[in-house]
Amino acid sequence: NLYSLKNLATLYFRYPELGKPKELAFEIWEKAWHAGVWSAANFLGYNYQEEEWLDLPKAIEWLEKGMLYCELYSAYELALIYLYNDDYKNVERGLMCLERCVEGDYIEGIEGLANVYFNGDLVEEDMSRAKQLLEKALELGSGNAAYRLGWMYERGFLSEEPDYVKAM
């Protein structure tokens, strides 16, 4: 089973008591990717963002590959780099990555895009769009979205006055 390659690499990476060097995990994840286990790109992209292995160009390369094969975690991680890392900032590409997350019902990405529209730092503030996205995340089971919607109603972001009934 090709997916066992990815799992084996993950075990080697997480459990040093197995006696395998962490570098071997990267090699095995790459083999898994080339064998068609697209989710291996998630592990590579994520771990190349970690301090010990920090290599953002490699992280971006793997996350782009993952997103190409519809890995929504890759799209989300890529969006964070493009939106918030000054050295790699590409707001248009970052928003496209988050829109992919919305299309694929990836809650963290939906909430992330809602936050972008709520804050208005990267795009024009749009409370209506933020609300729409949070409602979608709520429908998918996000407790965080429920809290944020309630908070927005409580503080009057979604109505002229605070709406304590809707906040509950």
Model-derived segments and spans:
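Hydrophobic face of amphipathic alpha-helices that form TPR/SEL1-like repeat modules
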Residues: 9-14, 41-50, 75-84, 110-119, ...
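Structural signature of tandem alpha-helical TPR/SEL1-like repeats
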Residues: 17-28, 52-62, 86-97, 124-133, ...
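Ankyrin-repeat and related helical/solenoid repeat scaffolds used for protein-protein interactions
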Residues: 139-168
